[in-house]
């Protein structure tokens, strides 16, 4: 695990593995961590933004406005009815916290959880649930979102353009590297051409 302010390399989870993680967390009553995984995926936000969410920001709203800490850019993220419903279910499972509370509180409650603590727990969940991922960190769910969009859009160039905008990357190359598109995958596309 990286130390504070140290760069890390993380990977995306295959979507089926992501769903398995959600089910394991749910079955074990790890609702706070299930909520973290869902919120990170559904918003595609960086962890520095995710930990700032309070319940009134995300519950029973059609969209979330986020001013990204890293870029200073503001994004409006739609929260579709299915996601709204799941967030309400999680809110109830978490004991209906005050709407002004952080979704992911620290043990003190009046502050959000730390990024270091999240990474510690993710490392623990990786081991406990035997997740098929080498580098599991706070960036994993954002990358999983990106890979999910790319895969469900049939690996289209349009999906890369959309992801580039959603993730606020400076270039398509950054987006490709971010979601784990490898040279082998690119070669595979060219090698699949048949006449």
Residue ranges and their predicted role:
Residues 34-46, 64, 147-152:
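Short pre-functional
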Residues 9, 82, 156, 180-195:
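DNA/chromatin major-groove-contacting recognition/catalytic segments
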Residues 82-133:
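Active-site/catalytic core of tyrosine-dependent DNA strand-transfer enzymes
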Residues 49-50, 146, 154-168:
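Active-site-proximal segment of tyrosine recombinases
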Residues 2, 15-43:
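Basic, Lys/Arg- and aromatic-enriched nucleic-acid-binding interface segment
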Residues 52-83:
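Conserved tyrosine-mediated DNA breakage-rejoining catalytic core shared by Y-recombinases
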Residues 133-152:
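Short basic/aromatic active-site micro-motif
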Residues 68-71, 167-192:
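Catalytic-site neighborhood detector that most strongly recognizes the C-terminal catalytic loop/helix
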